[in-house]
């Protein structure tokens, strides 16, 4: 069945293949274009450097008018990531625009890794360490980077 959402997701997939953003990749799971597996590589010169973080993206038939739900599968220690792996990111909620595609969502998440919003923490411990004890925060992040290699 070809719906507007599915057609748009196939365009997003084609863009990911022909013009992939640096450090992110994503593709639909076999036989279901509405669910995607994604990987974000931790940005260079950040505590997340060399991490390989896996995510899953779920799209509803209202996409692109409704944002996808995005969840880290890899363990993540970050002020804007809940223990469940779900993200607190404005473009996935109140600042969503149908102009965003899969590449834009993933690059926004990649940017968020080193530029957290501590004013709206999903992980209070990570937020407090980020603000008050950056050395310990970096240590905890590096632990998740090392775990990401085992996924």
From Swiss-Prot:
Its main location: cytoplasm. It catalyses: S-ubiquitinyl-[E1 ubiquitin-activating enzyme]-L-cysteine + [E2 ubiquitin-conjugating enzyme]-L-cysteine = [E1 ubiquitin-activating enzyme]-L-cysteine + S-ubiquitinyl-[E2 ubiquitin-conjugating enzyme]-L-cysteine. The gene is mus-8. This is Ubiquitin-conjugating enzyme E2 2. Its EC number is 2.3.2.23. The active site is at residue 88. GO terms for cellular component: chromosome, telomeric region; cytoplasm; HULC complex; MUB1-RAD6-UBR2 ubiquitin ligase complex; nucleus; Rad6-Rad18 complex; RAD6-UBR2 ubiquitin ligase complex; UBR1-RAD6 ubiquitin ligase complex. Belongs to the ubiquitin-conjugating enzyme family. The lineage of its organism: Eukaryota, Fungi, Dikarya, Ascomycota, Pezizomycotina. InterPro entries: Ub_conjugating_enzyme (IPR050113), UBQ-conjugat_E2_core (IPR000608), UBQ-conjugating_AS (IPR023313), UBQ-conjugating_enzyme/RWD (IPR016135). It is found in: Cytoplasm; Nucleus. It is an enzyme of class 2 (transferase).
């Amino acid at each position: 069945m070809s719906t507007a959402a599915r057609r748009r997701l196939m365009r997003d997939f084609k863009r990911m293949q022909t013009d992939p953003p640096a450090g992110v990749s994503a593709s639909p799971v076999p036989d279901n274009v509405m669910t995607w597996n994604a990987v974000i590589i931790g940005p260079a010169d950040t505590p997340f450097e060399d991490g390989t973080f896996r995510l899953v993206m779920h799209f509803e038939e209202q996409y692109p008018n409704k944002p996808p739900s995005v969840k880290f599968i890899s363990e993540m220690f970050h002020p804007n990531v809940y223990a469940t792996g779900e993200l607190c990111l404005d473009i996935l909620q109140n600042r969503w625009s149908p102009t965003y595609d899969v590449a834009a969502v993933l690059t926004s998440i990649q940017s968020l890794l080193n530029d957290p919003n501590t004013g709206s923490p999903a992980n209070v411990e990570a937020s407090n360490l980020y603000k008050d004890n950056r050395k310990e925060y970096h240590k905890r992040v590096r632990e998740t980077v090392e775990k990401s290699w085992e996924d």
